[in-house]
């Protein structure tokens, strides 16, 4: 069974690149450009991995992390932002990591072998 990735980010170019990268590696990829659409897809698709940007048109994505973790505790969440640093979101949950944009291809390759 193919793993599903949900990307919630308003940067169309970033989403296009990420979608292409993961589709070539046999992942199913869903994209939402705002929190509202992302939450709907999260509920409907039950992804294995979530890329969640913080600065979205309809709010701060990271504020939804507690709700997401409560609903899907096994979900691997990768919080991404060009404007924040890892210290801005501190968690002890091993399923949550923080990546700063731009994301390097080396980091993607190492994380998703």
Located regions from the model:
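Short amphipathic alpha-helix used as the core "switch/output" element in two-component signaling
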Residues: 62-73
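Residue-level signal for the "D+5" position in two-component response regulator receiver
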Residues: 31, 56-59
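Two-component/phosphorelay signaling modules centered on CheY-like receiver
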Residues: 12-30, 96
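Acidic catalytic/metal-coordinating carboxylates
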Residues: 34, 60-63
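Acidic, metal-coordinating helix/loop segments flanking the phosphotransfer/catalytic sites
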Residues: 31-49
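Active-site residues of response regulator receiver
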Residues: 53
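C-terminal output helix
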Residues: 103-112
């Amino acid at each position: 069974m193919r793993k599903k990735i949900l990307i919630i980010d308003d940067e169309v170019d970033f989403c296009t690149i990420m979608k292409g990268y993961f589709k070539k590696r046999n992942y199913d990829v869903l994209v939402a450009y705002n929190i509202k659409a992302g939450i709907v897809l999260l509920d409907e698709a039950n992804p294995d991995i979530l890329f969640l940007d913080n600065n979205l048109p309809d709010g701060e994505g990271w504020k939804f992390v507690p709700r997401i973790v409560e609903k899907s505790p096994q979900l691997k969440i990768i919080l991404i932002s060009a404007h924040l640093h890892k210290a801005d979101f501190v968690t002890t949950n091993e399923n949550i990591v923080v990546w700063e944009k731009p994301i390097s291809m080396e980091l993607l390759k190492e994380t998703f072998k």
